Amino acid sequence: MTTDTIVAQATALGRGGVGIIRVSGPLAAHVAQTVTGRTLRPRYAEYLPFTDEDGQQLDQGIALFFPNPHSFTGEDVLELQGHGGPVVMDMLIRRILQIKGVRPARPGEFSERAFLNDKMDLTQAEAIADLIDASSEQAAKSALQSLQGEFSKRIHTLVESLIHLRIYVEAAIDFPEEEIDFLADGKVSADLQTIIDNLAAVRREANQGAIMREGMKVVIAGRPNAGKSSLLNALSGKESAIVTDIAGTTRDVLREHIHIDGMPLHIIDTAGLRDASDAVEKIGIERAWEEIRQADRVLFMVDGTTTEATDPQDIWPDFVDKLPENIGITVIRNKADQTGEPLGICHVNQPTLIRLSAKTGQGVDALRQHLKECMGFSGNQEGGFMARRRHLDALERAAEHLAIGQQQLEGYMAGEILAEELRIAQQHLNEITGEFSSDDLLGRIFSSFCIGK
């Protein structure tokens, strides 16, 4: 438990009808007595004057006192709800800081104390920041699911399954004299496969949750005059890029942040790829390749009037060979209004082919639907949770160790190695909820929060 008391403004900085100051720590009741002149009843809203050290009134408003452990942080908490002007808020905070033993809160310190006092786990604490920063209704719903413990429940279920399997495996190791070979009886193999399958399902949902939080990066790439800028405008619904018949009009990277049924996408238009002699155009092409290498998916724009080919290897093998491994690619045959080709998704094998007209907008809805399906997302889904990059990394490492354990079990009946791999996998899963986390990791997470959270 901490011994110091912290204070910060819990509402956003700036002018507002109401401003809230939050105090947490062992001196919260003393602060309430000092500022209001009253001993506050627990969990009662009382309308009182807030005074300075000379008894002069600074403001008046509602005071709320929450004794530990029944508070957000698990400590004694005081909230003063006054008028939301920055001057009034500043005067009240300076008044509270005059009380010995009270200091300003660090960013995220209230949530950090809630975590340290077991009021929430790490995924729930992170969900507070994600809910505040949500850029769409769907993102807010997903963050709320995480805050309510949906992600944590999935992780705890996996951990409990691992614990039970570890007990069984380690018992088989500790009692080798038993006539029954526990490792070979099929139960261990079946239980391990079930855990691997359940982890894979959580990873799929977590990947989707990470996209909901961070957005999917989609890069439009191709030769000059293929219609890349027209497609950016069609997807964004506005004239973001200049469109002309002159090859090489786009010389720099253009970005638009859009939502498709609540799914955030970062759409990036790039310079036409070719052997350029112009120095400025060369820089634009270099930047285009930088964006391509970092993309979640590349939309390979093809001028449908210049070729009938649909396989990217036939259209431009040098371009395909330069793409990073495992990057998603969708072939877009543009200018269907001129070629008369059937619109929409033509085949869903790798890579998917879509025929459209960026100029008229025909077929663009099929592309929007395709982008959602690429990430396994449906705007009508409920119950999804928010995830962060560190969660994905921990889930991936856990899956890797389970796979190693499975190989050792099936190939060598190596119970000791399996037990160790199960232990490491459990440790990685515990990192997600904070049951096993370094102080450095906690510091990085909570330092990104708002001051009063």
From Swiss-Prot:
It is an enzyme of class 3 (hydrolase). Gene3D superfamilies: P-loop containing nucleotide triphosphate hydrolases, Probable tRNA modification gtpase trme, domain 1, tRNA modification GTPase MnmE domain 2. The keyword Cell membrane does not apply. Pfam families: MMR_HSR1, MnmE_helical, TrmE_N. GO terms for cellular component: cytosol. GTP binds at residues 225-230, 244-250, 269-272, 334-337. K(+) binds at residues 225, 244, 246, 249. Transmembrane segments: none annotated. Its EC number is 3.6.-.-. CDD domains: trmE, TrmE_N. Keywords: Cytoplasm, GTP-binding, Hydrolase, Magnesium, Metal-binding, Nucleotide-binding, Potassium, tRNA processing. InterPro entries: G_TrmE, GTP-bd, GTP-bd_TrmE_N, GTPase_MnmE, MnmE_dom2, MnmE_helical, P-loop_NTPase, Small_GTP-bd. (6S)-5-formyl-5,6,7,8-tetrahydrofolate binds at residues 22, 79, 119, 453. Its cofactor is K(+). Mg(2+) binds at residues 229, 250. One of its GO terms (biological process) is tRNA methylation. It is found in: Cytoplasm. Binds 1 potassium ion per subunit. GO terms for molecular function: GTP binding; GTPase activity; metal ion binding. Belongs to the TRAFAC class TrmE-Era-EngA-EngB-Septin-like GTPase superfamily. TrmE GTPase family. NCBIfam families: mnmE_trmE_thdF, PRK05291.1-3, small_GTP. Exhibits a very high intrinsic GTPase hydrolysis rate. Involved in the addition of a carboxymethylaminomethyl (cmnm) group at the wobble position (U34) of certain tRNAs, forming tRNA-cmnm(5)s(2)U34. This is tRNA modification GTPase MnmE. The lineage of its organism: Bacteria, Pseudomonadati, Pseudomonadota, Gammaproteobacteria, Vibrionales.
